[in-house]
Structures are given as structure tokens and as C-alpha cells.
């Protein structure tokens, strides 16, 4: 049987770190130990509480391929924002409201903004919690410290597989990690350096939703509950 293991680290009421694995029973102890240590050692500050939750996987595990990776040459934050602008224009979207929202995400959210691209309206039921893309892992994950790139690619690949999500934008909430991305099924994973300045206390992600009102629940259920294993080649 497979198990979902999730870690959440907090300082007071502030979320500072989260990570997860999907493992077989024989690998549970090692995964739990690695996630606990990771929760205690995070650039957002020391954790006052680390919670590790273990649940059996009860749905069939879906295997998907990782998105292809593209890495444009970017020299500074202005050029990074220009890359995002061009990606959004390529989807026939007005970049301004999307990017203004992205760069205003300063209070840590456990999840993402779910943005209806038709009316530029936020759809997440709880704006403080957001919509969480969870219950996923990737092949070859040995839990040897944090791998920003692989973990981001894993999450982006799962999100892009959702029929109602046409794109995702992300800035890491780690203050010293300045690489973000744009991702979609059409464009793949566009890795963008200098998306923010080192030390900036901002970060978050936006899922771009296009669909019917009745499909919101289906979309959120897939993102939060469908177990997914992302197949990655050696990167």
C-alpha cells in the first residue's frame, strides 16, 4: 500500500514550510524523518511546530510525464516580468491584473490563488488558505534536502494536467530563492530567473482557471486530492 506523508511547519500562526511524499510502507520512517528535519531547517525562520500527517492512498495513483523545461535568458527582474507578460499575452490574456496580483502576494498562503481568467475574479473559497495542489511526488525523489527545481516541476506538472487550468505563475516564498516559473500544457515549464530580488518577502502562485462554474469543484478536487506520481528523467 502507498501512503501520503505531508509536513507543515509553523512559527506561531505563520506557515513557513511544507513538503510531501508518496511512499510505500517500508519507506515511511525515512521519509518522515527527512521531512521533519526539513521543517526545522528553513530560510523563513525556525519552526515552533512541525506536523507530519500520514494517510493511506485510497485512490488509484495517476502517473504523468513531467512538463518539458525551457529556460529563457533573463538578466534582471524587469526582463523576468517581461517574460511573464509575453506568456500571458500569448494566451490572449491582459497581463496587468494577473501580474499585479502575483507581485502583491506577500502574506504566506498555504495554497494558491484560483483566478477565473474570464472575469479576473478569485474563485478560492477561503482566500487565506487558497487552493492547495497536494498529494503528489516524483520519481527518483530521495528526500535529500530541498530541491526547488524538481519540486516546482512536480507541482507544475500536476497542475497543468488539470483540464480547467490553462496556466500557472509562481514566485517562491523562500526569501533567498529568486527563480520562479510560468507553466502550462502548451508552453511547458518556463523557468524564470530573477523573478524577484533576493531577500524580498513576497511569493505565491496563481492557477489560471478557464471553465464553467460547475467545474470549479471538480478542478479543486483534482488539485487537492488526486494522487499523482510525476515521471521525471534525469535533470
UniProtKB/Swiss-Prot annotation:
Its biological purpose: Catalyzes the transformation of pimelate into pimeloyl-CoA with concomitant hydrolysis of ATP to AMP.
Indicate what this protein is called per its UniProt record: 6-carboxyhexanoate--CoA ligase
Origin superkingdom? Bacteria
Ordered alphabetically, the record's keywords are:
ATP-binding, Biotin biosynthesis, Ligase, Magnesium, Nucleotide-binding
Q: Which reaction does it catalyse?
A: heptanedioate + ATP + CoA = 6-carboxyhexanoyl-CoA + AMP + diphosphate
Spell out the molecular function terms from Gene Ontology.
6-carboxyhexanoate-CoA ligase activity; ATP binding; magnesium ion binding
Tell me if Lipoprotein is a UniProt keyword of this record. no
Q: Which cofactor does it need?
A: Mg(2+)
Q: Where does the signal peptide begin and end?
A: none
What the record says about family reads:
Belongs to the BioW family.
Q: In which pathway does it act?
A: Metabolic intermediate metabolism; pimeloyl-CoA biosynthesis; pimeloyl-CoA from pimelate: step 1/1
List the EC numbers from the record.
Answer: 6.2.1.14
What is the protein's species of origin? Desulfovibrio desulfuricans (strain ATCC 27774 / DSM 6949 / MB)
- What GO biological process terms are annotated to this protein in UniProt? biotin biosynthetic process
- What do we know about how this protein assembles, alone or with others? Homodimer.
